[in-house]
UniProtKB/Swiss-Prot annotation:
Residues 593-607 have a biased composition (Polar residues). Involved in nonsense-mediated decay (NMD) of mRNAs containing premature stop codons. Probable component of kinase complex containing nonC and recruited to stalled ribosomes. This is Nonsense-mediated mRNA decay factor SMG8. Belongs to the SMG8 family. It comes from Drosophila yakuba (Fruit fly). Pfam families: Smg8_Smg9 (PF10220). Keywords: Nonsense-mediated mRNA decay. Residues 568-582 have a biased composition (Acidic residues). Residues 560-607, 624-651 are annotated as: Disordered. GO terms for biological process: nuclear-transcribed mRNA catabolic process, nonsense-mediated decay.
């Protein structure tokens, strides 16, 4: 099929086409086609019945020319970034640059700037501009493009273009720098499918769109009353919007070919009735009295005629005729245009003019550093894109306003000194103030700038020390000012060692403040602490002035070897293995007897057996030294009998061996004093004593306290602990738990070389015990006291239950406390909006009136089982008879060199996660009148070996 038009790529005009265009002389009307397209070739000419060559490839900035023979219009097809094919090419180029992240805002600005540049060329080189829209409605963003075009023409082009045109063959165009105020037409390639495609409906749709466009362009001063100040022109009383309602554009070529094939292969059935054939034979010629076509009514004829006339080409030619007749601006503007405003050029003049515009606006723009003597043009090349990015300036202005508002909000609310948490809160408030004004792509960078300014303001003499206390509270003192003592401003309420006096304590920042200095200070204000009898726990005694804290490897070698006791040599390990093998071969009955009479342990319940080894480990070598006496005790127990007593009655009894007075002295003399264990006098233990710390290292100060606050009579089980004696207890939680312990006394065998006087004296004493029977029933009162930071104190009657009064105390209640792991932290039952954690701080023990001593050896497991802290005494303390004793636990626990902070909140499913007190801390032994309980250092290492753990 022969084409009735020519097409070429600017500026390569064919010679034959050039000759045809020369014949038009000064009757050439240039029409520019711009807008959107969806096809691969970026073709917007299909509505005009034209298309580029098959080998044509879309390219940004390319101009494809079309000329139809016998017409006076030259059509310029501008390929811009609004064409989907070219837009896809730009996206592919951006995606290939993997080092630079894809920024949509900058990409959109760059795409729009390139389109504006090509539109400027079209508006200055054409008489008529047809904007093609693939949608069904007018795109409001086009108004923004028109505003940018008007700004670019008035602020850039008119500053250099008239002057630079005077220096070219197109000097006659220098005054207005354009052919005319170009008439803008709008072509919509698609009509709404749900609307009927009648003349009335299509015309109504076109008129409605024209009114909308006219109002928008007039409102934004794109079209004014003067042609010189108008960017474009709109015809008066003439259609400038066209909807393609009847022709299908950009249809699938394969589907079209298949449809043509089906039509070619279709053959209508020509058979007719026999009667008709007889009549047709009488006809003088074929087709006689038969109509050529089916009858058509007037409406159908009118509809067909409307389809033929309603084409884009006819729509365009009406405006071309206005240009040829010289009435192009008539009715478009209220003010009469000046002479020479509208100009028609011949092909040669127009070609020179187009070449100048294309070079100035498109080609030179590829190199912003293009050498030129015109300063305005140089500014145009360098800042054209930046000047069009009005959104960027708008967002920058908003972010600047938000930045000022946010910084002001931060500085106005900032106190004289504040910490990191306050700084973060102020910064969050400043961010909220910023977001009231600032937004857009630059908001992220502006927020970072605001954060840096606020950070600098904070660090400029307003920063707090923020050294964390042992309770994780920051110091509130200024960082830049020297201070000897930290202060977090947090105040806790704590009781003294004896529990009688409560006082306010500052948040501690070191272990000495937490576990020693506060209790020494409050003891001076307590009239009971100065009177009580304190048990002297072992502490470091330096022999030199330059003593220091032990290094980690020296202080805690067992953590690296993985052992829980003192290092042994290879021979010792082999002996231990041999002993273990022999022990496994013993009969079950013999093992039971040895366990019952080993002088160290007699469990009352199965819950105690699992903690037996750990409990024994704390007593040191004294237990090993008492193995010989344990064997003698076992033989003595087997020979002893008790008349009228069944085995069932003795099942839960504890066996206590009674030794002769001279035997106790000999055993103690053989073992030597407790201070025979060598301790370092140059290095001290930096933390608390635990089961794997070196026995030779002692702490600088005691973190525990063991004190006798008075006789047992000061406690009445009917009234509990009174406020004048123990203050701060919650109602109903101030009772100790009674504990009944059954003992069976076993006498050691007498030595043959004893004097008759000693035998007679001891015999009388033993006879006096026998009158009381060989069994003793001890009543001990025990209380596990918890204390929260508000000073609330309460007792626990079970690991998961707070004592609520005397009604909660039953016969076996105390066994739940002493034979189970007691949590180190428990939620305080006080009524407060904030959940406070109470800490196990004291263990109350009221010893019985009996010829035995209660031995205490508390062990606290903290740090998920990593550390088990002890009193640090090789010899477990013996409590005097018929007395009220209180063990005060450490306020803060510190392992090797790391603080073990309390949990922020207690998990309901794991109350022991923060730590727990191990069971089996109590023991019982025969009273030895030769021992001085107040001076444990003088006690023999085996003084505590002969006792029974409860």
């Amino acid at each position: 099929m022969m084409k009735d038009y020519y097409t070429w790529t600017y500026p390569d005009i064919p010679e034959n086409v050039s000759q045809e265009l020369r014949q038009l002389k000064s009757s050439l009307v240039v029409v520019g086609i711009v807008g959107r397209s969806k096809c691969d070739q970026a073709n917007k000419m299909q509505a005009f019945g034209m298309e580029p060559p098959i080998e044509h490839k879309a390219k940004e900035g390319q101009v494809q020319c079309y000329y139809k023979l016998g017409t006076s219009s030259l059509l310029l097809h501008f390929e811009t970034t609004y064409d989907e094919a070219i837009l896809g090419q730009m996206i592919d180029v951006c995606m290939e640059d993997v080092e630079t992240p894809f920024d949509f805002d900058s990409f959109y600005e760059r795409m729009r700037c390139r389109f504006v540049r090509m539109m400027l060329l079209a508006l200055h080189a054409c008489h008529i501009v047809v904007y093609v829209e693939t949608g069904q409605t007018f795109d409001p963003t086009l108004v923004t493009v028109f505003q940018l075009l008007k700004f670019a023409r008035e602020q850039h082009l008119m500053q250099f273009l008239p002057q630079m045109l005077r220096e070219t063959p197109s000097a006659r165009m220098s005054e207005r720098a354009r052919l005319c105020a170009p008439r803008i037409l709008f072509l919509f390639e698609n009509f709404p499918r749900d609307e009927p495609k009648t003349r009335e409906c299509v015309s109504a749709y076109e008129f409605q769109t024209e009114d909308c466009i006219y109002e928008l362009l007039r409102h934004h001063n794109i079209v004014t009353n003067s042609s010189s100040s108008s960017l474009v022109a709109l015809p008066n009383n003439k259609q400038f919007v066209f909807f393609n309602a009847h022709e299908q554009l950009h249809e699938d070529k394969l589907l079209k070919a298949i449809d043509c094939l089906n039509q070619a292969m279709y053959k209508p059935d020509a058979k007719e009735e026999e009667e008709d054939l007889e009549i047709l034979e009488l006809a003088p010629f074929e087709g006689f009295v038969k109509p050529y076509n089916l009858p058509v009514d007037d409406k159908e004829l009118e509809k067909q005629q409307y389809k033929q006339d309603h084409t884009v080409w006819h729509f365009l030619q009406r405006h071309v005729q206005d240009a040829l007749l010289g009435c192009f601006d008539e009715g478009s503007f209220k003010q009469h245009s000046q002479q020479g405003q509208f100009q028609l050029l011949n092909i040669h003049e127009w070609h020179n003019y187009m070449a100048t515009l294309h070079k100035l606006l498109v080609e030179n723009a590829k190199d912003p550093n293009q050498e030129t003597s015109n300063e305005d043009y140089k500014l145009f090349l360098k800042s054209f894109d930046e000047s069009l990015n009005y959104e960027k300036k708008f967002w920058a202005h908003l972010c600047e306003l938000g930045l000022k508002k946010g910084i002001a909000a931060y500085k106005n609310a900032a106190p004289a000194n504040y910490g990191n948490s306050t700084h973060r809160q102020l910064l969050a408030d400043a961010t909220v103030a910023f977001e009231e004004e600032g937004r857009g792509p630059q908001a992220k960078a502006a927020l970072a700038k605001m954060a840096a300014i606020c950070q600098k303001h904070w660090q400029d003499g307003r920063q707090q020390c923020e050294q964390l206390s042992l309770r994780s509270h920051p110091c509130t003192l200024p960082k830049n000012l020297p201070h000897e003592k930290h202060n977090s401003g947090v105040i806790h309420i704590s009781s003294c060692n004896c529990g009688r006096t409560q006082g306010r304590r500052e948040d501690p920042f070191n272990l000495r403040q937490a576990n020693y200095e506060f209790y020494e200070h409050i003891a001076q204000m307590c009239n009971l602490c100065v009177k009580v009898k304190q048990y002297q726990l072992p502490i470091f005694e330096p022999s030199v002035s330059d003593y220091r804290a032990a290094a980690f490897e020296a202080a805690f070698p067992l953590l690296h070897t993985g052992k829980s006791g003192a290092p042994q040599d290879e021979d010792g390990e082999e002996d231990a293995e041999d002993e273990e093998g022999q022990e496994q071969q013993q009969p079950a009955e013999e093992q039971r007897q040895n366990t019952a009479s080993n002088g160290c342990s007699q469990p009352l319940s199965p819950t105690f057996g699992s903690d037996l080894n750990m409990s024994i480990a704390g007593f040191g070598a004294s237990l090993n030294e008492s193995q010989a006496s344990s064997e003698q005790l076992s033989n003595s127990e087997q020979n002893s009998t008790s008349s009228g007593t069944s085995s069932a009655d003795t099942e839960n009894e504890l066996v206590v061996e009674l030794q002769e007075l001279h035997a106790k002295k000999e055993a103690r003399d053989d073992a030597g004093p407790a201070d025979a264990f060598s301790t370092s006098t140059t290095e001290y233990l930096p933390g608390l004593v635990h089961t794997v710390s070196n026995f030779g290292l002692l702490p600088l100060f005691p973190s525990w306290s063991l004190a006798c606050v008075g006789p047992s009579s000061i406690y009445s089980h009917n009234t509990g602990l009174q406020e004048h004696f123990q203050s701060g207890f919650l109602s109903g939680a101030n009772f100790l738990l009674p504990w009944d312990v059954q003992l069976r006394l076993v006498h050691a065998p007498k030595q043959q070389h004893h004097t008759h006087h000693q035998q007679q004296h001891l015999g009388k004493k033993q006879q006096r015990w026998k009158k009381q029977g060989d069994r003793l029933s001890l009543k001990i009162f025990v209380g596990m006291e918890y204390e929260c930071s508000r000073g609330h104190r309460f007792m626990m009657c079970a690991p998961d239950r707070v004592l609520r009064g005397g009604a909660d105390i039953e016969r076996e209640t105390c066994s739940k406390v002493v034979h189970n792991n007691m949590p180190l932290y428990y939620p305080c039952p006080c009524r407060s909006q904030t959940s406070y954690l109470a800490q196990l701080m004291r263990i109350h023990v009221v010893t019985p009136k009996a010829p035995v001593n209660i031995i205490v050896d508390p062990k606290v497991c903290v740090g998920k089982g990593k550390y088990t802290f002890t009193l640090g005494s090789i010899v477990p303390p013996r409590l005097s008879q018929s007395a009220y004793w209180i063990i005060r636990l450490p306020y803060v626990y510190q392992g090797d060199d790391v603080l073990i902070a309390p949990p922020e909140k207690l998990e309901p499913d794991d109350p022991l996660a923060g730590g727990y007190l191990l069971p089996g801390m109590f023991g019982v032994a025969e009273t030895d009148p030769t021992l001085d309980l107040n001076e444990p250092g003088r006690m023999g290492a085996s003084a505590a070996g002969n006792f029974t753990r409860i």
